[in-house]
């Protein structure tokens, strides 16, 4: 069994489970006598190698990847930690040729036989292009709280993010009930509503708005939100929970980074209008306090759930197995309850096409069982 030199990096937004992947790769590789080099801060690490900031030995990961003092020495905690011990950056495609050349030079200096890339759709697109230029052998591992990477049912980090948002909705329910408030929660999801939909159902939301069904907040959708809230009021509920994805646009079809606040204002104004011209029942909504909150980067943090640790671990192990078999340019995926792998090229083609057309590469299925589940519960999803 020959020694191999492989690299591993994390790229794009962080999420729970990244360190569990790193741990699995390092431990499995160590048992084979391989050397694993941790590239700091995505492809920027290659630039720093090219510029002499790091030598190869500086990046060599040990069996545990870190050192702990005293009685903690040898304690294996990496799988429990959120974030990335390697660091991560979201910078887009290298715009200057000199930067791309430095990345390729840094990779060549390290003399790697393969590179494991833990990233989302954007990162995989960028690094695939670099790999083609540099003739790299790469294995991709999908990670994203958006769960929008094609071909895989789940990406590392998604399950924990759903749990974090669900817990937030649970906690907010009680303050909403105590003060008879309508609380609108803004959830991450640039183009995809998987996180918002899953957490909204699990967290007991009354209205869930995602870009696949509600690309923009039309006046009709806002009125329907008011009707949903009025019906809750008539049933005896004096509070409500609305979850909206950051990917939903405003009434002018413009992206609004404060879309929850925007929706709160629109519901207030529309309720007043309906009260004045149509039905006095809407006047009851006006008395309700409407508050908006954005969970932000809390969704990327937190201790990974056991399932995300398991998913990250089996993904890391499969990546090492593929390198051992010299099966390159693959993406490790989770499909129908088991780990598999697929050619990376067609996935990148889908990602590129969708990015050019401003579409999500793996959107929520409007006719899927999760959407049907929400509708069966009486949750309003923003249909006109």
Swiss-Prot record:
Where is this protein found?
Cytoplasm
Q: Can you tell me which residues bind ATP?
A: 13, 91-92, 120-123
Q: Which InterPro entries match?
A: ATP_PFK (IPR022953), ATP_PFK_prok-type (IPR012003), Phosphofructokinase_CS (IPR015912), Phosphofructokinase_dom (IPR000023), Phosphofructokinase_III (IPR012829), PKF_sf (IPR035966)
The protein's Enzyme Commission number: 2.7.1.11
Q: Which cofactor does it need?
A: Mg(2+)
Site-annotated residues for Important for substrate specificity: 122
Its main subcellular localisation, reduced to a broad class, is cytoplasm
Identify which top EC class this enzyme belongs to.
transferase
Give a yes or no for keyword Metal-binding in this entry. yes
Listed binding positions for Mg(2+) are 121
Q: In which pathway does it act?
A: Carbohydrate degradation; glycolysis; D-glyceraldehyde 3-phosphate and glycerone phosphate from D-glucose: step 3/4
Q: Name one GO cellular component term.
A: cytoplasm
One of the entry's Gene Ontology molecular-function terms is: metal ion binding
Q: Which reaction does it catalyse?
A: beta-D-fructose 6-phosphate + ATP = beta-D-fructose 1,6-bisphosphate + ADP + H(+)
Q: Which positions carry the signal peptide feature in this UniProt record? A: none
List the active-site residues.
Answer: 146
Coiled-coil segments: none
What keywords appear on the UniProt entry? ATP-binding, Cytoplasm, Glycolysis, Kinase, Magnesium, Metal-binding, Nucleotide-binding, Transferase
Q: What are the binding positions for substrate in this chain?
A: 144-146, 181, 188-190, 246, 291, 297-300
Provide a GO biological process annotation: fructose 6-phosphate metabolic process
Supply the Pfam families for this chain: PFK
Assembly mode: Homodimer or homotetramer.
Q: What does this protein do?
A: Catalyzes the phosphorylation of D-fructose 6-phosphate to fructose 1,6-bisphosphate by ATP, the first committing step of glycolysis.
Q: Which family does it belong to?
A: Belongs to the phosphofructokinase type A (PFKA) family. Mixed-substrate PFK group III subfamily.
Query: Which named protein is this?
Result: ATP-dependent 6-phosphofructokinase 2
Gene name in the database record? pfkA2
